[in-house]
C-alpha cells in the first residue's frame, strides 16, 4: 500500500514535458515523425495510473457542474452603468435559424488579415451553408470537409506562426470591408486561430557518472547548447474542426457564465451577439502532433465544418477551460499531454458501461482514501500504549516520505503534487511525536545556539516485549534489504544516466523504495506472530486501504497499466492477506483486558446491568501482567 503511493508520485513526477539526454521525449513531449523514437521502457513508465485518468474525468465533471450551476442562477442584477440602474436587455442571435451562409477560410502568416484579394491565401470557399441544418453535407450530418496541403515557407520552418482566418457571411456578402455594397458588418462573423502549436521541450543533461559518457543524440546535444535547456518548438496537427454553435439563447451581456463568455461576442451598437464559432481540437491527441522543421516541404490540413449543439459546446468549453489553479503560476496544476490523451482515449475506447462503473468506483475509492486517512489520524491521536506496534516502521515511513519529497523537488514536479507530498511528510512527523517522547534540550545546544532535539522511546514501548520483537524484525529484515540495496545502487550507477551525484542518490533511493518498499510492512507481521495477537492494529484504516488496493487490482488489469504497477498491487494484497490470516488465527479474546484496563465482558456487563442508587460498584479485578502483554 505504501508502495502504491510512491508509484503514483512517480507517474506525476515524470510528466513535465521533458526530454531526457538520450533524445527520447518524456511525458509532455509528442512523438516526432521521422525523428528519434522513445525508449520502450521509458514509454511504459510514462503511462499514467488509472486514478490519474479517472480523477481527470472527475475534475472535468466538476467544471461542467459549475457551469450548469451558473445557468440556474437568479435574474441578473441591474447594471449600474445603465440609466437609473435599469436591467440589461436580453440580446438575440444576429443569424436567425436556417440562414444561408458562405464560408471563407484564409491561411496567412499574419495575425491580422487584410489581403482579401490574394487568391493564394484563400484556402477554402464553401457556398450556401445553412445555419443550424443537420441533414446536409457530405455524409448527411450537416458536416463538410476539405483537404489540401500547404506550402511551407522558411519563416514557418524557423518557428514562425501560421494563422487561419475564417469568415461566415450571409449569402451574397463578402468579408472584405473595402467592397462597398458587398460587405455588411452585422452579416459577417470573423474568427482567427493559430494553426501551429508551440510546445516546450526541456533537455535533461544526463550522463553515466562513472564513465562520463551519454547515449544522447548528438543533434539533441547540439540543439541544447545552442538553444539552452528549454526549447520552444512549433508543432503541427493535420486536423481541425470548425463548429458553429446552433444556439439562439437570449444571452445578456455581462452575465454569460465562464468559460462560455470567452466565445460569445456582442455587437457594440445593436447589443445582439454573433453566432458562436468554436475551433474544436479536443479529439486531436497530443501524440499525433509532430514538429515543424527543415525536413518538411508542406503541411497537410484537413478542415471540417460541422454544426454543434449548445450542450455539447458547453462540454467542450469546460474541457478546454483554463485550470482555476493557474493563479499559483504556470503549469501549477495543468495536466501533462499524456494525461489529457489518456482521458480522451478512455472516453473513445472504453465501453460506456465500464466507464460509468469506473467513475462510480473511483468515487468510492476517494471516499475510502478519506476514511482511511481519518481513522489513521484518530488511531494515533487516541493511542495510549504502543504495545504491539512497530515504531521503527513509523520512523522508516518518515524517511520514505522525505526521499519522495526530495525526489519530486529534484525532478521539478508541479506545485500541487509537491504540496500533497509535503503534507504527508508533516503527518508522518506528527506520528513521530505520538510514538516517541520528543523534547528540546536547551542545555546542550548545537554550536551553542540551536537547541538540540532529543528523541526517546516511550515507556509503553520500552517496557514491553514489543521493542525486542521490533528490533529482531528489523535485524532479520536488514539481512535482506542491505544486499538488495547494494545491488540496486550498483545497477543504477552502472546502467542509468543521472544529472549528478545528488540526483543519483535520490533516484537510487526512490527506485529502491518503489521496488522493495513493501518489505517494510513485514516487521509488523513478525511482531503479531511473536505476540500471537492483532488486537493492537488500526483495523479500520487497514480495511479501507485494503479495499482501495482491491479496487486498484481490478482496474489495473481492466485499464492499460504498466506491469510494475500491477505487480505492486498484487504484492500489497499478499501482505494484507497475511494480516487477515493472522486476524483469523489470533482471535480477540473478550476476556482479555486491553491497555485501558477494560475487557469486552466488562462492557457487556455495564450495558446490561446498572448499579442501584447509592450502591458502590464492584472493583475491577486486575489481570495478571502476563495477560496484559497481549493486549
Curated annotation (Swiss-Prot):
The chain crosses the membrane at residues 353-373, 389-409, 415-435, 476-496, 501-521. Residues 1-47, 599-631 are annotated as: Disordered. It is a multi-pass membrane protein. Keywords: Developmental protein, Differentiation, Glycoprotein, Membrane, Transmembrane, Transmembrane helix. It comes from the Eukaryota. Residues 1-352, 410-414, 497-500 are extracellular. Residues 374-388, 436-475, 522-631 are cytoplasmic. The keyword Membrane applies. Residues 622-631 have a biased composition (Basic and acidic residues). Residues 1-23, 31-47 have a biased composition (Low complexity). Disulfide bonds: none annotated. It is found in: Membrane. The keyword Nucleotide-binding does not apply. Glycans are attached at residues 117, 159, 239, 293, 411. One of its GO terms (biological process) is cell differentiation. One of its GO terms (cellular component) is endomembrane system. Belongs to the CLPTM1 family. Involved in GABAergic but not glutamatergic transmission. Binds and traps GABAA receptors in the endoplasmic reticulum (ER). Modulates postsynaptic GABAergic transmission, and therefore inhibitory neurotransmission, by reducing the plasma membrane expression of these receptors. Altered GABAergic signaling is one among many causes of cleft palate. Might function as a lipid scramblase, translocating lipids in membranes from one leaflet to the other one. This is Putative lipid scramblase CLPTM1. It comes from Danio rerio (Zebrafish). The gene is clptm1.
Amino acid at each position: 500500500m505504501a508502495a502504491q503511493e510512491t508509484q503514483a508520485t512517480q507517474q506525476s513526477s515524470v510528466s513535465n514535458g521533458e526530454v531526457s539526454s538520450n533524445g527520447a521525449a518524456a511525458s509532455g513531449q509528442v512523438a516526432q515523425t521521422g525523428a528519434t523514437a522513445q525508449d520502450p521502457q521509458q514509454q511504459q513508465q510514462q503511462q499514467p495510473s488509472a486514478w490519474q485518468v479517472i480523477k481527470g474525468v472527475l475534475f472535468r465533471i466538476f467544471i461542467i457542474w459549475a457551469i450548469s450551476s451558473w445557468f440556474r442562477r437568479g435574474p441578473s442584477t441591474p447594471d449600474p452603468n445603465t440609466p437609473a440602474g435599469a436591467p440589461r436587455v436580453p440580446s438575440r442571435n444576429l443569424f436567425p435559424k436556417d440562414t444561408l451562409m458562405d464560408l471563407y477560410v484564409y491561411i496567412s502568416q499574419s495575425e491580422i488579415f487584410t489581403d482579401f484579394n490574394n487568391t493564394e491565401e484563400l484556402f477554402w470557399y464553401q457556398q450556401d451553408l445553412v445555419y443550424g441544418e443537420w441533414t446536409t453535407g457530405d455524409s448527411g450530418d450537416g458536416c463538410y470537409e476539405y483537404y489540401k496541403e500547404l506550402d511551407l515557407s522558411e519563416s514557418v520552418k524557423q518557428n514562425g506562426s501560421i494563422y487561419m482566418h475564417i469568415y461566415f457571411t450571409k449569402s451574397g456578402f463578402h468579408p472584405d470591408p473595402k467592397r462597398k455594397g458587398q460587405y455588411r458588418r452585422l452579416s459577417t462573423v470573423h474568427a482567427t486561430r493559430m494553426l501551429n502549436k508551440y510546445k516546450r521541450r526541456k533537455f535533461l543533461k544526463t550522463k553515466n557518472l562513472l564513465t562520463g559518457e551519454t547515449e544522447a543524440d548528438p543533434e539533441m546535444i547540439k540543439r541544447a547548447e545552442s538553444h539552452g535547456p528549454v526549447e520552444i518548438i512549433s508543432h503541427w496537427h493535420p486536423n481541425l474542426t470548425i463548429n458553429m454553435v446552433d444556439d439562439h439563447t437570449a444571452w445578456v451581456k455581462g452575465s454569460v457564465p465562464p468559460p462560455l463568455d470567452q466565445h460569445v461576442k456582442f455587437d457594440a451598437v445593436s447589443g445582439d451577439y454573433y453566432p458562436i464559432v468554436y475551433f474544436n481540437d479536443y479529439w486531436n491527441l497530443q501524440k499525433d502532433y509532430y514538429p515543424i522543421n527543415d525536413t518538411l516541404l508542406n503541411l497537410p490540413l484537413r478542415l471540417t465544418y460541422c454544426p454543434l449543439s449548445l450542450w455539447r459546446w458547453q462540454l467542450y468549453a469546460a474541457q478546454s477551460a483554463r485550470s482555476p489553479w493557474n493563479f499559483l503560476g504556470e503549469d501549477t496544476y495543468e495536466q501533462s499531454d499524456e494525461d489529457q490523451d489518456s482521458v480522451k482515449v478512455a472516453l473513445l475506447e472504453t465501453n460506456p458501461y465500464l466507464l460509468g462503473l469506473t467513475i462510480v468506483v473511483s468515487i468510492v475509492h476517494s471516499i475510502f482514501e478519506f476514511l482511511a486517512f481519518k481513522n489513521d489520524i484518530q488511531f494515533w491521536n487516541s493511542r495510549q500504549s504502543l504495545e504491539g506496534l512497530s515504531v521503527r516502521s513509523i520512523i522508516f515511513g518518515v524517511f520514505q516520505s522525505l526521499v519522495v519529497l526530495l525526489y519530486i523537488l529534484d525532478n521539478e514536479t508541479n506545485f500541487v503534487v509537491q504540496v500533497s507530498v509535503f503534507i504527508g511528510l508533516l503527518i508522518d512527523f506528527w506520528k513521530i511525536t505520538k510514538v516517541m517522547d520528543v523534547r528540546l534540550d536547551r542545555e546542550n545546544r548545537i554550536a551553542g545556539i540551536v537547541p538540540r532535539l532529543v528523541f526517546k522511546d516511550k515507556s509503553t514501548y520500552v517496557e514491553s516485549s514489543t521493542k525486542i520483537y521490533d528490533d529482531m524484525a528489523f535485524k532479520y529484515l536488514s539481512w535482506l534489504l542491505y544486499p538488495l540495496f547494494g545491488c540496486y545502487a550498483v545497477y543504477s550507477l552502472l546502467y542509468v544516466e543521472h544529472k549528478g551525484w545528488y540526483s543519483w542518490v535520490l533516484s537510487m533511493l526512490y527506485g529502491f523504495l518503489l521496488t522493495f518498499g513493501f518489505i517494510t510492512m513485514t516487521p509488523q507481521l513478525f511482531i503479531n506472530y511473536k505476540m500471537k495477537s492483532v488486537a493492537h492494529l488500526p483495523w479500520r484504516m487497514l480495511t479501507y486501504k485494503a479495499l482501495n488496493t482491491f479496487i486498484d487490482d481490478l482496474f489495473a488489469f481492466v485499464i492499460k497499466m504498466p506491469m510494475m504497477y500491477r505487480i505492486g498491487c498484487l504484492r500489497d494484497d499478499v501482505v494484507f492477506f497475511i494480516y487477515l490470516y493472522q486476524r483469523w488465527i489470533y482471535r480477540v479474546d473478550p476476556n482479555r483486558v486491553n491497555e485501558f484496563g477494560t475487557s469486552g465482558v466488562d462492557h457487556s456487563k455495564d450495558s446490561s446491568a446498572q448499579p442501584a442508587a447509592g450502591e458502590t460498584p464492584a472493583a475491577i479485578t486486575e489481570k495478571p501482567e502476563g495477560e496484559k502483554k497481549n493486549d
